[in-house]
């Protein structure tokens, strides 16, 4: 149990630091749809896709690796709550089309990046 908690905690810490850094560097560039938040979700979607395929193909790996990468790192990196707050802020400002665009970018982009991560693994591994 302790190994699992440490794996999740370490992954979450690194993922959250990366998300914070992306937000600090990029969000001011385009406040209507903050690119740091979007990039965090897209990167996280891609990594999750790769990880799901990799861990499915590697069942002998310790489960702590999955916890570290998927639950911890990607959980700390991706940010549904920040995305939700940004969309609500756009709606409150009367910028409905920007809010809808942000929703479309985050949701479709994350799903496409997850599929791309899966496809990348299958392409590289020849499966």
Swiss-Prot record:
What are the UniProt keywords, alphabetically?
Cell inner membrane, Cell membrane, Ion channel, Ion transport, Membrane, Metal-binding, Sodium, Transmembrane, Transmembrane helix, Transport
The protein's topology relative to the membrane is: Multi-pass membrane protein
Q: Which residues cross the membrane?
A: 4-24, 35-55, 68-88, 96-116
Report the InterPro entries cross-referenced here: FluC
Where is Na(+) bound in this sequence? 75, 78
Catalysed conversion reaction: fluoride(in) = fluoride(out)
Q: What regulation of activity is recorded for this protein?
A: Na(+) is not transported, but it plays an essential structural role and its presence is essential for fluoride channel function.
**Record's Gene Ontology CC terms?**
plasma membrane
At the top level of its lineage, which domain of life is listed?
A: Bacteria
Which GO molecular function annotation, any one, does this entry have?
fluoride channel activity
State any GO BP term from the record: cellular detoxification of fluoride
Extract the Pfam families matched here: CRCB
Q: Where in the cell is it found?
A: Cell inner membrane
| Chain's role | Fluoride-specific ion channel. Important for reducing fluoride concentration in the cell, thus reducing its toxicity.
- Family listed: Belongs to the fluoride channel Fluc/FEX (TC 1.A.43) family.
Q: What is this protein called?
A: Fluoride-specific ion channel FluC
Q: What is the lineage of its organism?
A: Bacteria, Pseudomonadati, Pseudomonadota, Gammaproteobacteria, Pseudomonadales
